[in-house]
Structures are given as structure tokens and as C-alpha cells.
Amino acid sequence: MNKKIFILLISLFVNFKFFSFERTITHSYEADYRLFPDTAYTEKYIKQLRGKYEVKYCVQSNIIIPKEAAKGYSCEQILKMLDQMGGLDKKCYGVSYIDYRTGERKAYFKKSSYDKNTGILYVKDKTIGGLYLDVSIDTYKQKENTYAISAILNKRPDNFFVRAIKKREAELFILLQETDDSINVYALVQSSSAPIKLKIFQKYVEGAVGGRVREIQNWFSRMICGQ
């Protein structure tokens, strides 16, 4: 068997085996929170997400991780390591993906830093370039521990092709919900800027944004599971 094909099959097997958790993902061209986990704070956060600006594009996904698989970092520990999201040399390979053509792991986020004092997260995306995000983290310790991370764009991207995305009108939202038997990892990206209404272009954007949402989730999952 060709060596590259063999490596690809092994990589995909490991990737799919690990991420065999229940996952749902949706794309919408309006505000859409149908996958938001049912928590005591759901209404609060949906109201916040809906009320900041007119949402014209929204990608959301939810993973349910069985508690017995959670052998890595705790949710609280992960929230202190957001600087590890960018770079293959970071914990759990940062936000990265397996290239289906070569079987190699490649970085979506090439660099990252997080200033806990200012709450600013910087990530260098492989295509978009540098993104600066204002991060706020809410922690709720009750029977079901819940952690909400909001990261809103604090300036327009430098990349010409995404300059239509406005300051404070695009964000990443993560919700981690710990129950007795599972951990929900909910991820959402939304923006007031929608892709051009050409089917081929929309498919490209949906693939690009959906891939990043999925791999952000996968990074949190690897951290939780210690992979």
C-alpha cells in the first residue's frame, strides 16, 4: 500500500475513533441557537448573543463527551490555558486539523497569546491572519458546573478579504456544561457579515468556518480527554 495512503488511513482512523462522540453542526444565515444546551443560563446567553447586532451568519455545533472519557484537564484548568490554542507545539496540538491528502496534522491557528489582565486573546489564523478578541469568562458552580466563554472581535481583521467583518460584530462563544454523566462542548461563531449569495462561495465559507468551529471543539475535547 502506498505509504501516504497508509498514513492517511491511520490518521483518519485515530481521528474518527477519538471523536466518535455525538456531534451536531448547523449553518444559518440569521440568528440561530437551536443547539444551545439546556442550562439555567441558556435564556440569558441567547438574549445576549441575539441583542448585540443583527446576526447574518451563524455556525454552531455541540459535542457530548461521556464523563468516563474526561481524563485530561478540568474545564477550569482549560480556561486558564487559552494561550495554548495556536501552534502545533502547544498543548494537544492547538486548534489544528488532519490534512486528508497527506495525513499530516496542520494548524488552523498558527500562533496564540492570551493576556489575563486585559482579557485579550490573539490568534493568528492560517488564512485570515491576526485576530484580536476581547474575552470574558463566566463560571457557575452548582450541581451542574457551567462555563461560558465569549470572545468578541475588538478590531477589523487585517486581511482584505474579510475586512467586511466589523469590530464587535463577530464573535466566538463556547459553553462547557458538566453534568453527572457527560460534558457538553458547545461552540458558536456568529457575525453581522454574511457570505456573498453565490452558492459556490457560500459552500466555501461554510466549509472554512465550519472546519474552524469543529476543530476549536476538538481542541477543547482533546484537552478534556487528555489526548
Language model feature labels by segment:
Residues 134-174:
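Hydrophobic-ligand binding "helix-grip"
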Residues 166-192:
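Compact beta-sheet-dominated globular domain cores
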Residues 20-129:
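Hydrophobic ligand-binding cavity/cleft-lining segments
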